[in-house]
């Protein structure tokens, strides 16, 4: 299995990208195609002495984070993310992994790979830590404005991913809302609720944001605006909590001594909330595996993102997504509005 890695995308490219790719290849996860500037990549590889199978596909064009995705794709047809995605389209790689611009990666996937089957809108699905292990949240940024049928399709895709890739039997799917009652929410969520209650999945109804971290819901569905806000808030909350703990610990000798006893537990907790543990987020709903990584991804995150890509390929995710029925045309009925 070959995975195309955009070696020039991300804040820490190419060094951390190459290190992560080498680590994944060394573990036998996959054969790696590093896409980027050959001279720079060879310099990095020379420092690492890779044991796995790695090849380089040269291109010196890069679409930066501050470039408009559509404009960048038009002007730089040989950019690293474009070439890496094209390798998937041509069957020369089974998946693409990138820590570059999310918007550019999405645009490249849609333009080059195309949408899956009857799916109208692709969605970014990410794992979030909970008291009962990682759960799936989607969409987290691909679509800031959605119609009810889009949320319905996100639920179908998330349900499939949770069952196939995460190995969760009969996943519990919930619709993120401002209340658990069926009549709560706006026009978007009311319409989505009516579609989902007749969907071929284990729909448990509306869930509130405060319930997410308890882990009772395996797949949480929302639009990309809300999902991205929750994701960024969660990242900031984790960082802030550990900063608060550190401040309290350093207030006295007694607290420092107590913290020493708790150190193994704190390290375990930090590992659970560390995004590098989860690697990258799949863009569901395109005709190929495209894994989107955090812009500041280090080698560990890249290695784990490649592992996510391998699992998606091994589970036949693209074919399964292409077989989904898409949103039905049933009439959406408005419920009562939230007070």
Swiss-Prot record:
A GO cellular component annotation in the UniProt record: cytoplasm
Gene Ontology terms for molecular function: phosphate:acyl-[acyl carrier protein] acyltransferase activity
Source domain of life: Bacteria
Catalytic activity: a fatty acyl-[ACP] + phosphate = an acyl phosphate + holo-[ACP]
Main location: cytoplasm
The entry's keywords: Cytoplasm, Lipid biosynthesis, Lipid metabolism, Phospholipid biosynthesis, Phospholipid metabolism, Transferase
Record GO biological process: fatty acid biosynthetic process; phospholipid biosynthetic process
UniProt pathway: Lipid metabolism; phospholipid metabolism
Family listed: Belongs to the PlsX family.
Protein name: Phosphate acyltransferase
Species this chain originates from: Moorella thermoacetica (strain ATCC 39073 / JCM 9320)
Lineage: Bacteria, Bacillati, Bacillota, Clostridia, Moorellales
């Amino acid at each position: 299995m070959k995975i195309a890695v955009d070696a020039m995308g991300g804040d820490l490219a190419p060094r951390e990208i190459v290190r992560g790719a080498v680590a994944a290849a060394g573990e036998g996860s996959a054969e790696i195609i590093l896409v980027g500037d050959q001279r720079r990549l060879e310099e990095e590889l020379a420092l690492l002495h890779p044991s796995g199978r790695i090849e380089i596909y040269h291109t010196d064009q890069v679409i930066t984070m501050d470039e408009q995705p559509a404009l960048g794709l038009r002007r730089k047809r040989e950019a690293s993310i474009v070439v890496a995605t094209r390798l998937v389209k041509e069957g020369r790689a089974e998946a693409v992994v990138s820590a570059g611009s999310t918007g550019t990666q999405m645009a490249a996937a849609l333009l080059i790979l195309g949408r899956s089957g009857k799916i109208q809108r692709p969605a970014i699905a990410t794992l979030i830590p909970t008291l009962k292990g990682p759960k799936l949240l989607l969409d987290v940024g691909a679509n800031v404005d959605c119609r009810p049928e889009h949320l319905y399709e996100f639920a179908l895709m998330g349900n499939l991913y949770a069952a196939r890739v995460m190995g969760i039997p009969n996943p519990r799917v919930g619709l993120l809302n401002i209340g658990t009652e069926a009549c709560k929410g706006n026009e978007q969520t009311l319409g989505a609720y009516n579609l989902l209650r007749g969907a071929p999945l284990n729909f448990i109804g509306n869930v509130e944001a405060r319930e997410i971290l308890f882990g009772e819901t395996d797949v949480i569905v929302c639009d990309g605006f809300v999902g991205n806000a929750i994701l960024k808030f969660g990242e900031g909350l984790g960082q802030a909590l550990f900063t608060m703990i550190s401040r309290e610990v350093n207030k006295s000798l007694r607290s420092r001594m107590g913290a020493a006893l708790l150190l193994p537990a704190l390290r375990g907790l930090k590992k659970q909330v560390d995004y590098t543990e989860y690697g990258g987020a799949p863009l569901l709903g395109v005709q190929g595996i495209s894994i989107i990584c955090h812009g500041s991804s280090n080698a560990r995150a890249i290695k784990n993102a490649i592992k996510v890509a391998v699992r998606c390929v091994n589970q036949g995710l693209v074919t399964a997504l292409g077989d989904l029925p898409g949103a039905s045309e049933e009439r959406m009925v408005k419920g009562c509005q939230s007070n």
